[in-house]
Amino acid sequence: MMRSMHARRGATALLLSGLAGLLTACGTMQSPNPPSAMPAPVAELAPTARLRAAINFGNPILAVRDAAGQPSGLSVDLARELGKRLGVPVELVTFTSAGRVVEAVKNSEVDIAFVAIDPVRGADMLQTPPYVIIEGAYLVKNDSPIRRNEEVDRPGNRIVVGNGSAYDLYLTRELKAAKLVKAPTSPAVTDVFMAQGMEVAAGVKQQLQADATRLPGLRLLDGRFMVIQQAMGLPKGREAGARYVSAFVEEMKASGFVDASLKRHRVEGALVAPPAR
């Protein structure tokens, strides 16, 4: 009888051991994780298992095309670094205007974007603290009577801005007497300004400086009329992702990544934003 009990115990132990081994083997089997099984920030930032980054060629401080025609610049560097941190491939989705970028974020056509902080845009997306600050400037013809920024907002003055740009949004709120005329994109501002005989062009200082070099008879007004805080934006509803990207932005500023990228791409007219409070 004792031998029978020992035999049953041995068989039970053997069976349990076999089951444990089977469960362990099953637990260590590897299978691809779908996006829904990823950690929360990755699932929110890359719901298609790739990071779709909006790159706006309308702002040359953030993005240009290199000699091979490929996207290059600070925003491209940041997008690729974020993709590396998340362990997902990066898809660069290119645009020619900030207004179109905002629409793409609003419609979740992209996962991250590089846009100016503005209360109007903030209604349609989540935004991080700024990573750079950019100066906005005015351009006039050499024979213009306008000499100071304070003289621009006067009756009879027509100011050309890129449709949907940060300057458009800002001046729409602030102007009292001058009239806004909207070019289709920011890079087209000076050409519209010249072709239609307007009084003032407004935009990124660096872009306008390049236009003044390209076209004769133009000058920039001294100083700046506004400072743009450039941030990263995400579609609404991705709060965990926004917290992750906000921390990423702060690290990129503190580590010198942003400053090094600006210098590598020979960008002038932009400064690394101070730490968020």
Identify what each model region corresponds to.
Residues 22-25:
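C-terminal motif of bacterial Sec signal peptides marking the signal peptidase cleavage site
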Residues 89-97, 161, 178-186:
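Short beta-strand-to-loop elements that line the ligand-binding cleft
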Residues 99, 116-124, 170-173, 194-226:
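A ligand-binding cleft/hinge motif common to bilobed small-molecule-binding domains
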Residues 57, 133-143, 205, 209-250, ...:
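Periplasmic-binding protein-like
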Residues 34-116, 255, 264:
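Extracytoplasmic small-molecule ligand-binding "clamshell" domains
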Residues 51-55, 150-166, 179-181:
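Short loop->beta-strand "edge-of-pocket" segments that line small-molecule binding or catalytic clefts
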Residues 76, 80, 84, 89-153, ...:
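Acidic, polar ligand-binding/catalytic clefts
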Residues 27-29, 35-36, 73-85, 143-144, ...:
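Extended ligand-binding regions for polar small-molecule ligands
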